[in-house]
Amino acid sequence: MDCGPPATLQPHLTGPPGTAHHPVAVCQQESLSFAELPALKPPSPVCLDLFPVAPEELRAPGSRWSLGTPAPLQGLLWPLSPGGSDTEITSGGMRPSRAGSWPHCPGAQPPALEGPWSPRHTQPQRRASHGSEKKSAWRKMRVYQREEVPGCPEAHAVFLEPGQVVQEQALSTEEPRVELSGSTRVSLEGPERRRFSASELMTRLHSSLRLGRNSAARALISGSGTGAAREGKASGMEARSVEMSGDRVSRPAPGDSREGDWSEPRLDTQEEPPLGSRSTNERRQSRFLLNSVLYQEYSDVASARELRRQQREEEGPGDEAEGAEEGPGPPRANLSPSSSFRAQRSARGSTFSLWQDIPDVRGSGVLATLSLRDCKLQEAKFELITSEASYIHSLSVAVGHFLGSAELSECLGAQDKQWLFSKLPEVKSTSERFLQDLEQRLEADVLRFSVCDVVLDHCPAFRRVYLPYVTNQAYQERTYQRLLLENPRFPGILARLEESPVCQRLPLTSFLILPFQRITRLKMLVENILKRTAQGSEDEDMATKAFNALKELVQECNASVQSMKRTEELIHLSKKIHFEGKIFPLISQARWLVRHGELVELAPLPAAPPAKLKLSSKAVYLHLFNDCLLLSRRKELGKFAVFVHAKMAELQVRDLSLKLQGIPGHVFLLQLLHGQHMKHQFLLRARTESEKQRWISALCPSSPQEDKEVISEGEDCPQVQCVRTYKALHPDELTLEKTDILSVRTWTSDGWLEGVRLADGEKGWVPQAYVEEISSLSARLRNLRENKRVTSATSKLGEAPV
């Protein structure tokens, strides 16, 4: 059934360009109606915004603009008072006009439509909803018909004159204003009513509302004349092959939509030229950025879902057992961590959070042919793109809301500001370019896109910005604490900024640590892609290269941070430790502090009878480095006097778990050897069980090969996963992020454990309160199998000939 209007009401099919008659969608609050607006007779020169018509052409004899108000402009022009363009007529009389009073302009507020514009000009009025002036903020947008997509040259070139030169200023904040002489009235013979299905109506209205004020910007900037308009339309449709429009209708390109109160929630306001002709320096509107959640919110949701996956049994038909992923079938809804907040994003009118939700993907029928493993692979790739948009969203808040605050800049000095925010703007720019390339790759082939080669290409840029930012993290933390204590204005200004809804009342520190969290998360996302890539394929090689590059970058960042801390510790200790006798060169680039602390030395009293052993106790302080051990006594002013030192190879430790002759406490025996002979022997007592075990583990560390055997697939060892982020407070502790999996080596009765992280083989101590045990045997075996899969791929790449 043809729902289109009669040919007599479609003059654009036979008449000259620009006279096309289009239905207009009018939205007031939550009431929707589609109808033709009655013609409005302008009593005076009219403001014509956004239409590139020269004043000379308007006054030229015979011009189609001089004959009257064309159909596309009926109901869209706000008449001005006879006084000029500086006043506008409202229901209450004349008042000064506002700049950019067109709905497509920033902060547009069209005049109220409840009453006549002037007592002298009683024109036909549109209905008012609810009768309230506050609820009369109307939005108007073009709704393109299906038949206009292939044939209408004005689908993008809205009201574009043939041969007209369009200037680049079409995207500026204030559009050119042209006065139209004459008051010839052209009215509709019979307003046409259209019926739309509920889904089609909501799809069209939702997509139009999300586009914002510059709905015609693409056509106005693409070129000059009708030919340029046609070219702009064709290239725009090609570039948006994955546009999320379920009914496949043409629509304008995204404009400068404002969301939030900051000025940089997007990549750029520049127009998107054809993909083939776009230069490397040009950027375009991100498809995901404007509607993405903050990265902090994404990270919490994604981590929670990964924790559930790592605990889950592999018994159900939809679980991740290898045999269950091969058969074809529709994918489950929770293939991606992003799916946990699908409802939130849909309520906000956002873009798609799952690859399978893209209309082009659903309409292609590919979901019925892909295996569950392949579907999860595509979702893992898609999550990398959407999470990058969330990351840039949070960086935009940090740069625009905090760094861009005039009050905060006035409070801070130039040096403090540099130390506090470091290279955050450079990190944001690098991520914007990365997201742009990712989106272009997605648009090129939405069904079979790849991202690992894009990640690999951007790794050098990541290193240039992430390495110095993460390295300066220690100075950043110190500057923040010093400003809180020494700058009286800083806490108050910061508290007001953190209470703003722009940052969702999140603290500044949660934004400053984002770069290190992101580079770690990015490695994890690429690792998830590698786990699901077919073995022996070219995609596996590319994913492995990207994973290795990110892994090396993370290790380099960690090493850089540790190197600074270790050097500072050695410099600090060298001022406090004094040797008795031989001078020991303490400061060395190859030396770092492993553990230090005070223990109790127990020694038998010489006068005590043999039948009744009595022990004397005195404090001894231990400084354990990676290559030597120093035993010293505390002196005044916090200094230490070393009386014994030994190399690591000369140490032996025995755990005296049973009480010796009724000796209370947690005791162990330390022996210092010289060749094959014992040189010194100390009976030491710790305060807690965990302290004793940590000293024994540090004094006699296991080899890296032994640590690898702990996480081998053939041996089922206890596993725990991190449920709360933990930052190491001592050198022998392990910093953990959510979802990290540890293979446990030692448990203590007072709430500590020693484990080896599966992802990188790092060993350390963590409080048990920050982890939970993985009780499922099948889940533990799956975690070991996935770790072996990644290890095998990386080792195979290392063995390949160059």
UniProtKB/Swiss-Prot annotation:
Record SUPFAM superfamilies: DBL homology domain (DH-domain), PH domain-like, SH3-domain
Any GO molecular function: guanyl-nucleotide exchange factor activity
Ranges of residues in domain PH: 592-704
GO cellular component: cytosol
Domain called DH: residue spans: 376-560
Disordered: annotated segments: 1-21, 84-138, 171-190, 222-283, 306-342
Start and end residues of each SH3 domain: 715-776
Biased composition (Basic and acidic residues): 245-269, 306-315
InterPro entries the UniProt entry points to: DBL_dom_sf, DH_dom, Ephexin-like, PH-like_dom_sf, PH_domain, PH_ephexin, SH3-like_dom_sf, SH3_domain
GO aspect biological process, one term: regulation of small GTPase mediated signal transduction
Compositional bias ranges of the Acidic residues kind: 316-325
Record keywords: GTPase activation, Guanine-nucleotide releasing factor, SH3 domain
Short name of one Pfam family: SH3_2
Database matches in PANTHER family: GUANINE NUCLEOTIDE EXCHANGE FACTOR, RHO GUANINE NUCLEOTIDE EXCHANGE FACTOR 19
Function: Acts as a guanine nucleotide exchange factor (GEF) for RhoA GTPase.
Name of the protein in its database record: Rho guanine nucleotide exchange factor 19
Native source organism of the sequence: Homo sapiens
Gene name tied to this protein: ARHGEF19
